[in-house]
Each structure stands twice: as C-alpha cells, then as structure tokens.
C-alpha cells in the first residue's frame, strides 16, 4: 500500500505518465497496517490463539488511533479531500461524524460532474460504500456512465476485458502510447463484487461458511431495468433475477440449491403486498424471509418509487 491510490485521476499534477493519486500514501499505508493487524487478530481468534489475538487486536486499535489523531479534526472532518480518503473513512468508520463525511464525498462528486477519480485502492470500495451509505443512485450512475472515466466507456470502445488504466484506449480507438498499459487488469474489475452483492443481490454470509446460507438482497434501478446472476458455490448453484415491468411492479425469481437455505430481503415491498408475498415466500421476520431449497418467483407492487438523489449541504 506504499504505492497509494495507484493510477487515481485526482493528482493535481497530471501528465501522461502520472501514476500517483492525490491521497496521502502514508494515510493509506498506515490505515491498511491497522486493517491488516485486525485481520490477523481475527484469524488468531478463530484458530484459538488467544495471546496472538490480543496482541494484534491491540496493535490494530493503536494504529487506528494514530490514523484518526493524525488525519481527522476534533469534529470528525477528514483533512484529505479525495474520493478515496472519504470512502476509506466511511468503510472503516474513522470519523465521529459520518453525515459530515457523506456530505464531503457528495460535494467532491458534484465538483467532478459525478465522475469517479479513484485508483486501485478507492475503486474496489467505491460502489459498495456508496450503496451501504444510502447513495445507491450515485453508484448506479457511475456504473452506467459511458464517458471517460468509466466502465461503459471501455465497453463502447469494444473492450472485452477491463483495462489497467481508465484511458488505455483513446477516444478514437487507438491504444494509448502510455507505458505500463495492460489491456487485461483486474483492479477496476472489482466492480463485479458490487454487481453481485448489490445489483443482483447475492451475498455470502460470514456466519455460514461454504455458502450453506446466502442472502438475496437486490437493489433496484429503473435505468438498468433488470439484472440476473448465478453463484456456483461450494454448496451448490444459487441464482436470482429481477425485472421491472414499470416503475410500480417487479418480478423476482430465486433458486436455492439442495440442503441449503437463503435469507431474502426484498426491496420496496408495498404494505398492501406483504401478505401476497408471504404466501409465496413464507412468513417474514425482521424484514427477512427464510427460503428452503427450491425455486421461487414473486411479483409485487413497489412502495412509492423515490429517486434518492442526495442534496449536498456543506
């Protein structure tokens, strides 16, 4: 992580060979030191190594405190004003004022005309953090953007793989003359995680290793209209599909493999439809339906469709 937010587009000194983003590399490196120590502590706990667990948990907490003291004001404002820094802040709950952080992040996106500027560190977090923090419409807007920089910009230029750089091909279709220019690079392909977890809505659950139980929790978007995904897990094939016939009705189909279960969290179910949905999926508990193995198809009317366009107030 000492390379920072590699290939981000927000460095004020831009040039054909610029590779470093504007997010402080020491902020990223120190933060991931804390995160890594926490992962080691968690693994040690699972394996029963209590002494090591306590050692690395203490290290993680101390390092998080160092990051917060160095890079955050007393009111919780992050002193690094980049998309990646604020995404990390929300992901790892570094600020005591997350509403302020969300407003800061939305302001940055307004200033960039709702275009991403993230690199190898920020992009894997980008859409997941936006959706998890009530900015799902912005996440979809970033996915569906056809201009540079964006995923569909690459598709429009004929890409069948994800590039290392957002501009590996120029707008006229010629290969950029920039050095270090891979045409098949995973980093920005990390958008697939968000597409599985939030668009289609298939989520593995840490409490159920081997995907013996998954969660179906799709998010709907009128600009996309439908989505479908399959997950060939160690326990069997899960699948889900949703399709909007109009802005008031959706049909969702779900398949749960033999000897497995799924937890379904359906979006925007109108109150008048809950009884009909329960006839297909069974009783609801805390907004969740427990599905046994089998095929399910449910159609229902949506609650009032409200575009959740956030208002930026500084």
Report the location of each language-model feature.
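The feature captures the catalytic groove of carbohydrate-active enzymes
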Residues: 1-61, 65-128
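Non-catalytic C-terminal accessory modules of carbohydrate-active enzymes
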Residues: 58, 137-314
